[in-house]
Design a protein with these regions (language model features):
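Structural signal for the C-terminal ends of transmembrane alpha-helices
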Residues: 1-7
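Membrane-proximal, lumen/periplasm-facing interface regions of secretory-pathway glyco-
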Residues: 9-69, 78-94, 100-103, 120-128, ...
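Residues that mark the start of a beta-strand
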Residues: 70-72, 115-117
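Short beta-strand scaffold positions
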Residues: 74-76
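Extracellular/periplasmic bilobal clamshell ligand-binding domains
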Residues: 102-115
């Protein structure tokens, strides 16, 4: 009885390790190849895909703004702020995280965004009604894009200008 119990444990271990390896290989293959088509806006890649393209689009929008005021990018979510800062490194634009709570960005960012022309990333999953909640001389849409994998939308971004940002409406 003891021998068959050890054999059962050994076989269970082999099966569990085998299933884990197959699952891991499938997950890595999907991550590298993106061969599974997910429903629109339900992709597991939405938090990691498209930031390079969004940074390039924001750079183009910033270049088209001829205002004499300083220009910067802005987001309202700290996790998105980290990604935008990283993918913006080749372009060198300032990024402000306006998430209305105390976090690490309040320590790292000593400059105030007041007086800047801020270009907000408004994505399908993280956006702010700039006109309604922020004090700006004017608000305008600078463009946008859909991010797709295998013909299915992963995320959408709209670039929204807040010209001469003066804070949050009370």
């Amino acid at each position: 009885m003891l021998i068959s119990s050890k054999k059962w444990h050994k076989n269970f271990l082999y099966v569990a390790v085998g299933i884990s390896l197959v699952g891991m290989l499938l997950a890595y293959a999907e991550l590298a190849g993106k061969f599974i088509r997910f429903p629109e806006y339900n992709s597991p890649f939405r938090d990691i895909y498209g930031y390079r393209e969004m940074a390039a689009g924001a750079h183009d929008a910033l270049q088209k703004n001829n205002s004499p005021r300083p220009k910067a990018l802005a987001v309202t979510n700290w996790t998105m702020g980290s990604r935008v800062m990283y993918y913006n490194l080749p372009y060198g634009h300032e990024v402000f995280v306006l998430d209305f709570r105390q976090d690490q960005f309040d320590i790292w960012q000593t400059k105030s965004p007041e007086g800047y022309d801020l270009l907000f990333y408004n994505t399908k999953f993280e956006n702010i009604d700039v006109q309604r909640f922020l004090l700006c001389d004017s608000v305008s849409v600078a463009g946008g894009m859909d991010l797709t994998i295998n013909g299915s939308k992963v995320n959408s971004v709209e670039y929204v200008w807040c010209h001469n940002y003066q804070g949050v409406k009370k």
